[in-house]
C-alpha cells in the first residue's frame, strides 16, 4: 500500500464524526465547505511537484473535503423529491436516483476518455524512457487544476440551492397533505 493510499484510510474516522456535524449545519454549507477544502487540496497537489509530504497533505485535504460531498449528495435527492411533492408533482425518488447514477457513470466514462485524449495530445508515450514535460504537466493538470475548476462549478451551483431553507415548511406541508389524504382514504393507510 502506497503512502497516498494510507491517507484515504485516515479519512475513515471522519465518516463517523460527520453525522453529528450534519445536525448543526445545512447540507448546502457543508457541501460548499467540502468543496473549498477539496479545492485547497487540489491546488496543493498542483504546486507539490514531486514533494511527497505536500502530495500527502493535498490528498488528505482532497479526501476530507470529499466526505461531505459524498455523504450528502443523496440527501439532496430526497430534498428534491420533497420539493416535487410540495409543488404538486410526483416525488420521483427512483427517477432522481437513477438519473444521478446514470450521470455519475456517464461522467466517469467521459472523464476517463477526456483524460486519455488529453494525455495523448500532450505527448505521453508509455514506452519512452523519459516522459516529455508536456505530458508531465498534463498529468499534473488532470490530477489537480482541472478537477479544481469542476469543483468551482459545483460550488457556484450549490450557491443556487435554496430549497433547504424552506425544507421545514415543505416537510410540514407535505405531512399535512398526507394526513388529510389518509383521513379521506383510510383504506390506503397500510398500502
Segments predicted by a language model, with ranges:
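Membrane-embedded alpha-helical bundles of multi-pass transporters/translocases
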Residues: 1-191
Amino acid at each position: 500500500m502506497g503512502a497516498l493510499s494510507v491517507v484515504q484510510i485516515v479519512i475513515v474516522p471522519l465518516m463517523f464524526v460527520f453525522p453529528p456535524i450534519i445536525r448543526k449545519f445545512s447540507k448546502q454549507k457543508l457541501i460548499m465547505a467540502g468543496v473549498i477544502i477539496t479545492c485547497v487540496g487540489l491546488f496543493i497537489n498542483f504546486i507539490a511537484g514531486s514533494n511527497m509530504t505536500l502530495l500527502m497533505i493535498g490528498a488528505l485535504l482532497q479526501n476530507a473535503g470529499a466526505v461531505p460531498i459524498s455523504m450528502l449528495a443523496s440527501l439532496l435527492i430526497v430534498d428534491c423529491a420533497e420539493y416535487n411533492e410540495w409543488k404538486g408533482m410526483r416525488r420521483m425518488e427512483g427517477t432522481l436516483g437513477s438519473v444521478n447514477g446514470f450521470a455519475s457513470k456517464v461522467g466517469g466514462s467521459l472523464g476517463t476518455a477526456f483524460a486519455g485524449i488529453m494525455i495523448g495530445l500532450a505527448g505521453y508515450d508509455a514506452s519512452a524512457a523519459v516522459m516529455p514535460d508536456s505530458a508531465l504537466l498534463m498529468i499534473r493538470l488532470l490530477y489537480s487544476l482541472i478537477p479544481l475548476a469542476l469543483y468551482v462549478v459545483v460550488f457556484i451551483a450549490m450557491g443556487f440551492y435554496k430549497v433547504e431553507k424552506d425544507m421545514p415548511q415543505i416537510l410540514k406541508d407535505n405531512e399535512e397533505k398526507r394526513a388529510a389524504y389518509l383521513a379521506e382514504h383510510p383504506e390506503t393507510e397500510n398500502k
